[in-house]
Amino acid sequence: MQTVQKHDHLFLDISQHAMRLDLLARTALYEEVSLAHKPGLVCPTTQGSHQDMDFALFERSIQSLTYYFQEQCLNGYHEVSFDSIRQCGIQAEQDMMAATKQINTHKGAIFNLGFASAAVGKCFAQDILLNAISISRMIQQTWQEELLHHLERNPNSHGQRMRSQYGITGAIEEVASGFKTVLDVAVPHYLEIYAKTGDKKRASLQALFALMSHLQDTNIVWRGGLSALYIVQDMAKQFLARGGVLQHNWMQDVSKVEDYFVRHHLSPGGSADLLGVTLFMLKVEHEFRNII
């Protein structure tokens, strides 16, 4: 991890940096939900497999999170306790649920990007060059043990029930790993397609399918069992093997996957959450490239 000499302006500007980070996080969430052709997921033109959600609901949800990521960035900068970071996230969940009338739109994003934002704050405090790798390492070094061993888990949550019933991991383990799946899978696929096409939307969709091909998505298992997970992973792998969004007829190919997901009421919500993390990390690296 690269460190550099302290700069006084960084300490003077931390509040401004945290505000910019907050906007980046909310923009990443907005771009994720705005992306079309996500199988089973909400976008501006479809509810996907969700009868209780639409694009306007997600917009209200994102608006309710204004200042949350700023606060978590400052929490990381000031090295507050793990429990304080967690309580900040719980309050954001309550605000989100109030805005959506108790529909869970962004619980995963609050958890994922909350710790990612706090990690950015700690990188600011230690004058560490900001990129996806340094954010990942900061999460692992600072909170991995507490995430894996001390975070209270609700035995009735669908994630915990998936762990107990099927032995699959979920969001807690992914965050504790420093978003290993994001770094190893999503970011490389995104960068490859963006370098070839210059199209951020196609790059994002390719990253989503890459995540779907690898992730043990508890949202899929919750709705369709392990058999559905294997089918989803295989469909995503086959799409990528055919060239993914580089195919001449890629939209027709994706539409077949979309139809299957809606018919079987499947929604890769875990992969969507990690696409949001992917976009956030790329935005942070670009925005703060020359800040240290």
Swiss-Prot record:
<dbReference type="GO" id="GO:0051191">
    <property type="term" value="P:prosthetic group biosynthetic process"/>
</dbReference>
<dbReference type="InterPro" id="IPR017555">
    <property type="entry name" value="TriPribosyl-deP-CoA_syn"/>
</dbReference>
<comment type="similarity">
    <text>Belongs to the CitG/MdcB family.</text>
</comment>
<comment type="function">
    <text>Involved in the formation of 2-(5''-phosphoribosyl)-3'-dephosphocoenzyme-A, the prosthetic group of the acyl-carrier protein of the malonate decarboxylase.</text>
</comment>
<dbReference type="GO" id="GO:0005524">
    <property type="term" value="F:ATP binding"/>
</dbReference>
<dbReference type="Pfam" id="PF01874">
    <property type="entry name" value="CitG"/>
</dbReference>
<keyword id="KW-0067">ATP-binding</keyword>
<protein>
    <recommendedName>
        <fullName>Probable 2-(5''-triphosphoribosyl)-3'-dephosphocoenzyme-A synthase</fullName>
        <ecNumber>2.4.2.52</ecNumber>
    </recommendedName>
</protein>
<dbReference type="InterPro" id="IPR002736">
    <property type="entry name" value="CitG"/>
</dbReference>
<keyword id="KW-0808">Transferase</keyword>
<dbReference type="GO" id="GO:0046917">
    <property type="term" value="F:triphosphoribosyl-dephospho-CoA synthase activity"/>
</dbReference>
<keyword id="KW-0547">Nucleotide-binding</keyword>
